[in-house]
A protein has these predicted regions:
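Leucine-rich repeat
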Residues: 1-450, 454, 458, 476, ...
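C-terminal recognition-helix end and immediately following basic linker
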Residues: 451-452, 456-524
Length: 532
C-alpha cells in the first residue's frame, strides 16, 4: 500500500514524524533507497540536522555527511549528562564548523574551554545556545565566542560573557534570555543591558540571576540616567536575583506592559533601593482591583506575592534573610516603594508558619508599619507562630487611635493552635474583634483551619468536641500529656501528671484530663464542663 504513495505525501508523513523525533531522520533513510533519495532531496522541508552528541564519532564521520546544519548536544543543563573527557575532540570538531552550527547545548569544563579560542569566526546561523559550567566552576568565555543576529534562545549558568550588552545588541530575534548564577566578573551595567534590549519585540522571557554582590558598585551609586524607556511588548515572564539598586536601575529603563509572571529575589541589605519598582509595576496593563497579597515568612526568606483573582498574573518578591525583625524591616521598605499600587489591595494574608524564632525585643510597631500600606484591605488572613503578636499589635494600634486596616470586614484565622498556646491566641482574637465592634467597625470572624492540635499524633481539629472525641477514641488511657506531647508517666504515679500540669500548663482546666484518663478522677480537686 505504501508503495503507491507519491513523494509529496511521503514528505508530509516524514515531516510529522521528524517534528517529534528530529534526530531519527537517518533511520527513515535506511528503510530503502527510494526513501533515502526523498529525504536527501528535501533537507530544508524536513529541517534535517546532524546531531552531534554522546557516543557518536563526530570527528571521524562529520566530513562524510552532506553539509547539513549541526546540533551540538553535550549537556547544557542539570538534567543532561555532561560530556566525558573523550568527547572533547568530537565537540571541537563540530564547533569548528561554526558557520553550520544551528544549536548548542553544552556543559563546559575548564579543559574544554581552553580550546574555544581556536573556533573560527562567529556562529552566524546559531539560533539556540545553552551553556552550563561543569562542577559549579565560574567560567569566562573567550571574546572569539560570539554569534550573529539569528539567536532566539540564550541560557547560561555560571558563565561570564565579555561585553555581553555588545553581543546581545544584534540579536533582535531573541525570544528567551536566561542568565543564571552570573559570576562577579560577568557583571554588566544595567543601563547598557537595557540599551541592548532595544528592539527585541519578540522577547518573552527575561531572567537575570547574579551569583553574588557586584565586585565594584561605582556604576550603581548614581540614580538611573534620564532617557527613553525600552518597550518589550511580548515580555510575559521577568525574573531577577541580585541587589536592589541594580534592579531599580534596570526597571527604570524598561516597560513591559503585558507581564504576567514577575519573580524577584533580593539579597539581604540594610537599606533597599527600589524607588522605580512601583512605577514599573503600575505600567503593566493589568485589570483593576481587587488584588490579593500574601506575605510569607520562612526560616530563610520573607516574600510578598501579589495576584489578581481570575487571571494568571503573579508578582512574587523575596528577600533573603533569616531573622524575623530583619525580614519585617526589609519587606516594609518594599511596601513603601509599592504603596501607590498596594492601596488597591482588598485581600491581605500574613503567614508566619515557617518563620524563625521571634526576637525577645521584637517591636510590635513593625507589624503595624507593614499593615499600614493596606488601607483598602477588606479581608485579612492570619496564620503562623506570630498570629497572636500580629493581632495584639492591631488591637494596641486601635486603642491608640491609630486604626490599621480601616476597611477590614472579615478576619480569617488560619491557625493550628496547641492547647498550650490557645489561651493567649484566643484572647488576642477576641480582644481585637471586640475592640472593632465597640468602635463601630464590626469584623466577622472565620476560623478557616484547625484550632486544636493533639500533640501526641499531631492531628488538628477545628472544633473542641472533635478534639475530645479524638482523644477518647485514639488515646484511651494514654499516659502522655496531650498538651505538649512530651511528658509521660506511669499509672501508679498519676500525681506526677498533675504536678506537670500545674508547672507547665497552668491555663489548662484539670478536669479536662478526665476525658483522656478517667483513672485520674481521684486527683482532680474540682470538675468542669469541657465543652464550655
Amino acid at each position: 500500500m505504501i508503495e503507491v504513495l507519491c513523494n509529496d505525501i511521503l514528505v508530509n508523513i516524514f515531516r510529522h514524524y521528524l517534528d517529534v523525533s528530529p534526530q531519527f531522520w537517518f533511520t527513515l533513510g535506511h528503510v530503502c533507497r527510494s526513501w533515502r533519495r526523498i529525504i536527501f532531496t528535501s533537507p530544508l522541508g524536513l529541517c534535517l540536522r546532524l546531531h552531534c552528541t554522546h557516543r557518536k564519532p563526530v570527528l571521524k564521520t562529520l566530513d562524510y555527511w552532506p553539509p547539513l546544519p549541526l546540533v551540538v548536544n553535550y549537556g547544557g543543563s542539570p538534567r543532561l549528562h555532561p560530556p566525558a573527557p573523550e568527547d572533547e575532540e568530537n565537540i571541537m570538531a563540530a564547533l569548528e564548523k561554526a558557520a553550520r552550527v544551528h544549536s548548542i547545548s553544552l556543559t563546559v569544563s575548564n579543559s574544554l574551554l581552553k580550546h574555544f579560542p581556536i573556533i573560527p569566526g562567529p556562529f552566524s546561523e546559531l539560533e539556540e545556545l545553552s551553556l552550563q559550567s561543569q562542577d559549579n566552576a565560574q567560567l569566562t568565555l573567550p571574546s572569539a565566542f560570539w554569534w550573529g543576529h539569528r539567536l532566539r534562545m540564550l541560557h547560561s549558568t555560571r558563565i561570564a560573557f565579555p561585553s555581553l550588552p555588545h553581543l546581545l545588541s544584534p540579536s533582535q530575534d531573541l525570544v528567551d534570555l536566561q542568565l543564571h548564577e552570573i559570576p562577579g566578573v560577568g557583571y554588566f551595567p544595567p543601563e547598557a543591558f537595557a540599551d541592548a534590549l532595544c528592539g527585541m519585540i519578540q522577547l518573552q522571557t527575561l531572567s537575570l540571576h547574579f551569583l553574588s554582590l557586584p565586585p565594584r558598585r561605582t556604576y550603581l551609586t548614581l540614580p538611573p540616567p534620564p532617557g527613553d524607556r525600552i518597550v518589550l511588548p511580548a515580555l510575559t515572564c521577568f525574573k531577577y536575583r541580585g541587589i536592589s539598586k541594580y534592579l531599580d536601575s534596570l526597571v527604570a529603563r524598561i516597560d513591559a506592559p503585558h507581564l504576567v509572571v514577575i519573580g524577584i529575589t533580593l539579597f539581604n541589605q540594610p537599606t533597599l533601593d527600589a524607588s522605580h519598582l512601583g512605577s514599573f509595576i503600575n505600567r503593566i496593563e493589568m485589570q483593576g482591583s481587587p488584588y490579593r497579597v500574601d506575605i510569607l515568612s520562612s526560616g530563610g526568606t520573607i516574600s510578598i506575592t501579589i495576584t489578581h483573582p481570575g487571571t494568571v498574573t503573579k508578582l512574587e518578591l523575596k528577600i533573603s534573610c533569616k531573622q524575623l525583625d530583619w525580614q519585617l524591616s526589609s519587606i516594609c521598605q518594599i511596601c513603601d516603594y509599592l504603596s501607590p499600587f498596594l492601596f488597591r489591595v482588598e485581600d491581605l494574608g500574613i503567614d508566619t508558619t515557617g518563620s524563625s524564632s521571634v526576637p525577645d525585643d521584637m517591636d510590635a510597631e513593625q507589624w503595624v508599619r507593614l499593615m499600614l500600606a493596606f488601607r483598602s484591605a477588606k479581608d485579612f488572613r492570619v496564620a503562623g507562630e506570630c498570629a497572636t503578636d500580629i493581632l495584639r499589635a492591631l488591637h494596641s494600634a486601635d486603642e491608640g487611635q491609630k486604626t490599621v486596616l480601616p476597611a477590614l470586614r472579615n478576619l480569617h484565622v488560619q491557625e493550628r493552635v496547641s492547647m498550650l498556646d490557645f489561651g493567649p491566641f484566643q484572647d488576642s482574637v477576641e480582644s481585637f474583634v471586640t475592640q472593632r465592634r465597640l468602635s463601630g467597625h464590626s469584623v466577622q470572624l472565620y476560623y478557616s483551619e484547625s484550632r486544636y492540635t493533639c500533640q501526641i499524633c499531631c492531628v488538628g481539629f477545628r472544633l473542641w468536641q472533635d478534639f475530645i472525641r479524638h482523644l477518647k477514641e485514639k488515646h484511651p488511657h494514654q499516659y502522655m500529656c496531650p498538651y505538649c506531647g512530651i511528658f509521660q508517666w506511669s499509672k501508679e504515679r498519676n500525681y506526677l501528671f498533675l504536678e506537670h500540669l500545674e508547672s507547665e500548663h497552668p491555663e489548662v482546666v484539670p478536669a479536662d484530663v478526665l476525658i483522656l484518663n478517667p483513672d485520674l478522677e481521684s486527683f482532680i480537686p474540682y470538675s468542669h464542663d469541657a465543652g464550655q
